[in-house]
Every structure is written in structure tokens, then in C-alpha cells.
């Protein structure tokens, strides 16, 4: 029976996904429900299930979303988005380029994709709604930019890739990866532009004249500077991104820039539970060999062509 635990764990994980999908229930809640049963089937304990909840992931998810909930309260992101739209005028094709470059720069200057994923989608979605673009299109284009930027030689991702390549006796891989990643993301951005009919939007849905926009107030300036502070803590002080975001959000609350109660209520708790709980169940599946089973099965059917 024990040798079949890998198959059973993998099958039960798939059942969790299907049940959550068809019953329209948060997959994280279903994952914990099945996790309680699975640890008893496999002779594990509740500690094994609880131990699968990543405190690091919790800190990152809650810290970043809390910080940006605080920033959003001030209206800083909305005003920044409107100023970008006013700057572009009727040249709608400029906006996707600006969003792509913003994603590339924020990820590429050192922090990598994680903090950029918190900044770019929020800004891109606001811009898209204001001008009449499909929000998903502009978010995806922004993410293409940060996926390219994360491959600059100074990001955490580059360090991981360089280390793995060095173990395989491959040197100086990042320049090639950066060029390839940039080219691929530019092409995919064009694809998104045409799929979501971005080229058909000729002028903003809500035209904005530069002179009609108010200036950033003190709270909004401090809120935007808090993003810079988070990046400084991350890049130069080497503070964990979740901890840095929590700390900066705390400062915004302490100095009355934002309301902590409203920020906490606005967090995407459903998504946070989903990510953490599914991770916990996957930890059980991994302990039982389900992940290795799936990896080995894929390895048997893969060729060089299908793998790439």
C-alpha cells in the first residue's frame, strides 16, 4: 500500500482542483479539507500539514498587498496613471511602450520580478480603464516588460540562473538570456496588442488635458516615495521584500498617511488563502512522492523538442 501513496496523493490533489473548479469553492479551503484526511491516510500528522504553510510566502503576499492598499487609499496611483495618460495625449500606442519599459526598469534595476509584479499590474490596470484599453492587455504587456527586466545580471533571478549554469560548466549566460527574453516578450506584447484590439483604440475614453490635473499632495508624494523606500531596503539593505513592505506600510499607518483598518479589509484574503493552502497540500503530495512521480512520467515522454 505504501508504494501506492505517490499515486494516491497525486490523484487526490487533482480531485481537489476539479472539485473546487466545478463547485466554485476556494481551492485553498478544499485543499485544507483534503489535507486533514490525507495526512491520516498517509500516517503523517497535522504538523506536516501546518508546516507546509509558507511563512515566507505569507509575509510577501500580505506585506506587498498591504503596502499597495495603503498607497491606493491616497489616490497616488490613480493620479499617476492620469498624468501618464495626459503625457501620451492621443498617441495611444505610446502607453503600452511606457508600461513595458516601466516593468523592465523596475524589475531590472535589481529587485527582480516580485516587487514589480506588485507595482506594474496595478498601474497598468488603472491606465487601461481610463483610456478604454482592455485592462488584461495592458497588464500582460507590463508583465512582459518585467519578465524581460528580471534577466538583467543584477537581479536575484540572474544569480540563481548563473549559479545553475556554472554547475553545468556554462559561463556568461545572462547576456544571451536577456536578449532572448527581451525579444520574446516584445513579440508577445505585440501579439497581446492585436489580440485585445489595442490598435483600434485611437483616443482616450476620457481625454485628459495636462493643465487640468491637480498636483500630487503631500500624502500622495509620501505614498509614492514609500515604493522607492521599499526598493532601497530590498536592494541596498538586503531586507526581505515582504518584511520591507510590511515595515514601510507600518510607517504610512503610523504617520497617518493611510488607514490600516481600511487597508486590511481590502486585502485579497481569498487569494492569499488559496496560495498558502494549496502550497501546504503540495507539500504533502511531495512528501508522498507524488511530485517525483509526475516529474518522472513527464521525463519519459519528453524529447528535446517537446521540452523546449
Give the ranges of each region predicted by the language model:
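Transmembrane helix boundary and interhelical junction motifs in multipass membrane proteins
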Residues: 28-29, 111-121, 138, 152-158, ...
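Membrane-core helix-loop-helix motifs of multi-pass transport proteins
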Residues: 127-210
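Short leucine-rich amphipathic alpha-helices used at interfaces
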Residues: 1, 7-8, 95-96, 102, ...
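Residues that define the loop-to-transmembrane-helix transition and helix capping
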Residues: 28, 93-94, 136-137, 175, ...
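Membrane-embedded alpha-helical segments and adjacent helix-loop junctions characteristic
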Residues: 30, 44-130, 264-308
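Transmembrane alpha-helix interface/packing and boundary motifs in multi-pass membrane proteins
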Residues: 16-24, 102-112, 143-150, 233-237, ...
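Hydrophobic transmembrane alpha-helices of multi-pass small-molecule transporters
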Residues: 1-60, 68, 180-293
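A broad structural signal for alpha-helix termini and local helix breaks/kinks
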Residues: 23, 41-42, 88, 131, ...
Amino acid at each position: 500500500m505504501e508504494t501506492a501513496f505517490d499515486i494516491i496523493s497525486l490523484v487526490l490533489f487533482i480531485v481537489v482542483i476539479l472539485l473546487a473548479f466545478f463547485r466554485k469553492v476556494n481551492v485553498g479551503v478544499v485543499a485544507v479539507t483534503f489535507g486533514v484526511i490525507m495526512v491520516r491516510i498517509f500516517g503523517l500528522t497535522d504538523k506536516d500539514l501546518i508546516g507546509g504553510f509558507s511563512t515566507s510566502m505569507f509575509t510577501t503576499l500580505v506585506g506587498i498587498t498591504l503596502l499597495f492598499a495603503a498607497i491606493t487609499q491616497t489616490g497616488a496611483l490613480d493620479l499617476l496613471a492620469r498624468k501618464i495618460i495626459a503625457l501620451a495625449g492621443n498617441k495611444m500606442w505610446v502607453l503600452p511602450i511606457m508600461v513595458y519599459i516601466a516593468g523592465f526598469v523596475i524589475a531590472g534595476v535589481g529587485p527582480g520580478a516580485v516587487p514589480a509584479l506588485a507595482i506594474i499590474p496595478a498601474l497598468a490596470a488603472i491606465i487601461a480603464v481610463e483610456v478604454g484599453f482592455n485592462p488584461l492587455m495592458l497588464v500582460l504587456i507590463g508583465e512582459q516588460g518585467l519578465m524581460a527586466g528580471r534577466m538583467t545580471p543584477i537581479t536575484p533571478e540572474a544569480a540563481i540562473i548563473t549559479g545553475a549554469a556554472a554547475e553545468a560548466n556554462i559561463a556568461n549566460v545572462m547576456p544571451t538570456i536577456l536578449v532572448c527574453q527581451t525579444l520574446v516578450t516584445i513579440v508577445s506584447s505585440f501579439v497581446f496588442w492585436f489580440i485585445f484590439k489595442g490598435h483600434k483604440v485611437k483616443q482616450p475614453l476620457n481625454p485628459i488635458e495636462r493643465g487640468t490635473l491637480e498636483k500630487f499632495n503631500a500624502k500622495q508624494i509620501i505614498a509614492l516615495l514609500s515604493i522607492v523606500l521599499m526598493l532601497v531596503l530590498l536592494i541596498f539593505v538586503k531586507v526581505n521584500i515582504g518584511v520591507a513592505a510590511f515595515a514601510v506600510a507600518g510607517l504610512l499607518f503610523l504617520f497617518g498617511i493611510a488607514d490600516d483598518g481600511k487597508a486590511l479589509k481590502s486585502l485579497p484574503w481569498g487569494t492569499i488563502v488559496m496560495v498558502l493552502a494549496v502550497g501546504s497540500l503540495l507539500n504533502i503530495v511531495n512528501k508522498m512522492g507524488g511530485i517525483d512521480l509526475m516529474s518522472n512520467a513527464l521525463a519519459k515522454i519528453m524529447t528535446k523538442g517537446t521540452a523546449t
